[in-house]
């Protein structure tokens, strides 16, 4: 048998073991102090430890801007910056704010700076939170606000004089001093206005009232006259059940249901557009052509007077993407341009990022992103007839993000990687004339230049803020793996530094014992394509040693996950625990292989119809190359872990390469595609291949997904595999892990299963039980050591 851990049955976790074989246990087991050292550098404990790592500017009409920061004690401050004078001034000290608001029963730490407005004699600072309070600056006089403060779940108008909320599945409009009125009618469960739909994978917390959210997929026109949004229809979808086995204050399990169309279901989410004239309440409902959907990550792209622009897509074959114009007064829809491809179509090299598209009001012009030449570049398009007036950027490199457009100066600002060669994931800053001409480098020096590019619609749809409204300045955060972030104000005409805004305080990170990783350039399995990896070395690594190696993988086609900046390396989106595992004696490697985003289209499309298979080929090739560069790596002891698509990939690694990968931890894995969500909005058929609507075969699995099901390879398992799932995970439903477990049972393969009660998809970041078991699993089965008998501290945001 495997040597089991001491039996423990905590309230929210039970380990079910199906075990055989025997692991060699080292005579020198790890100590509790080793785990404590690993804890200190865990991503969740270090989140926020890197103080003032970035600056989000809030621009005023006069060209100044303000931003928030933390002082040396972690208290919030606000700074006012005058770019013309190259000066910054703290608007308030925390102690002064405390004193000023105390007479009104408020305390500074419980207030949030909601807005700053210029007045004749200075500024008005509006605070929300414990109490609505207005403060005058520089006189620093505070008083309770006389104006109604928008609630936290409100969507404010551009002028700030009205806001939207969702009530009873409809949008309601309110202004200070006036009663709220319904702006839409006819909303109903599963087909509301501004309601967060279940396809966003947050249905359970929304139903529980734990997620007050602003109106979803809704936006104002710049002049505040119109409200436009996307209406989702989930009424025809089947109910999908989740069983909460240990609900609070009850011994009776509770069933939650959400609306979910899985791959191959005849009914999937449908969407339409609507526009409401706020002045007279006139509403236009726009039905999309059959088979077309609004591109879910794009939403509404922009406005030009009374004309709205959006991107919609059709995922038949070939796949088609359209830029469309909708007249707000009549609801008439017109196609501006159309692109097609047999694989993916998207408006950014990363589909999770905001579309690299800008509508230029009054110019009959759009800056449009396209991969039509095989890379990812910007084009100037005439809106009146869809004619491409010119390709603005070009070359064997890809635009990363469109940072803003200075219409008056006729410049488009963007970030890109690999323009001058080198690491294609390291961003530089550039601009290009709207009417054509050479690309001008503003900042590209080998360090990464992160400029706020806004967020995609699925993550709130916020517009970029880094470029000043007048186009004269950019806010740029400069960093590398070894260098903490430094945020500067940069002149947009030549890229010169105007002033330093913040130098991040990394003292808490360093004190915790965190060490920067290394960057390596490698070759893919084809022997030609450069790929890149980030490596976390054990503290005591030496070339004459023998250190096991762990492949820390995500691999989803939406992003890349090998860090290139200090902040990413300290506390990552996915995967986490890399620095922690290095402290436990493992070399930990993250690789951006073929099939992930950020590069050219062919590189990205390697995962189309193949999911993680090409990536795993590249990972094996890369690890073998690293074994030649780092003689201390023991390639007879290779492990892998991942979460979500990374969980799928980790399990698949042990099943496709059973003699190479010996130990794996797969949490919240999307182990088959037929059990995942389908459809055009963000379904597996859209992301990884096939023609919509996906039609099941006689076996119930739509082609071409049968070969991507991990269960089909269950008989190949030879190593140690720990499967992990949270019972309320809407992103990767628990059934997917249990279906793989059933296939492993049928094949009489041994594995381990960790069930986490009340947990959702965040378990890999916030669950100490998962983290503990994952570390133990690699220590016992890969390092051959006995884990210490210790308990990890709770992680921030973990389950109660």
Regions found by a protein language model. Name each.
Residues 9, 13, 23, 27-460, ...:
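Beta-propeller folds
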Residues 63, 305, 311, 409, ...:
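Serine-hydrolase catalytic core recognition
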Residues 4, 36, 500-501:
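Hydrophobic alpha-helical segments with strong N-terminal bias
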Residues 1-7:
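N-terminal secretory signal peptides that target proteins for export/translocation
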